[in-house]
């Protein structure tokens, strides 16, 4: 008897290419990796990327790793190289208002589906970072710490992170005072102090507890001085 998809045997091999190599050996390529940026932020979009790399490792991508472990300069250097050398890539942005409407987990799953659907080629297998994504058109596997374990997920993490960081830097100009270019919408002390002083802006996730609390405190102060 045969089964589909075939059983994948992960052998000890070179670094981040282990999973993709194992899947390719069983005829399940091309392999797409999917990752997000901004899940833990309280402002700005959730950005999701999908990426399919060529089977043969390329020198320009040798420094690929989890985007959070890379310096900003390294990410910026890898970003155009990934887009140039990848067989296919796709980036999806889910705005803060949609995150509020459907919730961060659903937004993450739906964004991953959209990113995979946006690829210029149909993947034979999809590796996702951290959790299962139902509704994909290809077999998939959630990989804990995937952005540090599979090159295609690491590439997707860089695409998502750099794209989102640039969006947040631009947002700092349209919504000055919050420091978005510095903290990228995450709940740092600098951001929380600005949120307390200014109240939420349209790019904040209005259903998040700390954003709600800041809005309430601002209204209370306005009531006392009104």
UniProtKB/Swiss-Prot annotation:
Put simply, this protein is called: Ribonuclease HII
Whether Metal-binding counts among this entry's keywords is yes
Q: What is its main location?
A: cytoplasm
Origin organism is Rhodococcus erythropolis (strain PR4 / NBRC 100887)
Give the protein's function.
Endonuclease that specifically degrades the RNA of RNA-DNA hybrids.
Residue positions annotated to bind a divalent metal cation are 35-36, 129
Question: What keywords is this UniProt entry annotated with?
Answer: Cytoplasm, Endonuclease, Hydrolase, Manganese, Metal-binding, Nuclease
What GO molecular function annotation could you give as one example from this UniProt entry?
A: RNA-DNA hybrid ribonuclease activity
Q: Which domain of life is it from?
A: Bacteria
Q: What is its EC number?
A: 3.1.26.4
Family membership, please give it. Belongs to the RNase HII family.
């Amino acid at each position: 008897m045969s089964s589909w998809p075939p059983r994948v045997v992960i052998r000890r091999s070179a670094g981040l290419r282990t999973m993709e190599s194992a899947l390719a050996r069983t005829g399940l390529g091309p392999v797409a990796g999917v990752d997000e940026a901004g899940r833990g932020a309280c402002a700005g979009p959730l950005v999701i990327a999908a990426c399919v790399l060529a089977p043969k490792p390329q020198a320009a991508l040798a420094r690929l790793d989890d985007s959070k472990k890379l310096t900003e300069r390294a990410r910026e250097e890898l970003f155009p190289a990934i887009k140039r050398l990848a067989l296919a890539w796709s980036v999806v942005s889910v705005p803060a208002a949609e995150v509020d409407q459907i919730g961060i987990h659903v937004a993450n799953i739906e964004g991953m589906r959209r990113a995979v659907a946006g690829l210029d080629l149909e993947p034979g297998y999809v590796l996702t970072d951290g959790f299962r994504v139902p509704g994909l058109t290809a077999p998939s596997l959630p990989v804990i710490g995937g952005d540090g374990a599979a090159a295609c997920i690491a590439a997707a993490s860089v695409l998502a992170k750099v794209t989102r960081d640039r969006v947040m830097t631009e947002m700092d100009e349209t919504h000055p005072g919050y420091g978005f270019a510095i903290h990228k919408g995450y709940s740092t002390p600098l951001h929380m102090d600005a949120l307390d002083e200014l109240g939420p802006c349209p790019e904040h996730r209005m259903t998040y507890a700390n954003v709600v609390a800041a809005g309430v405190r601002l209204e209370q102060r306005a009531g006392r001085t009104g």
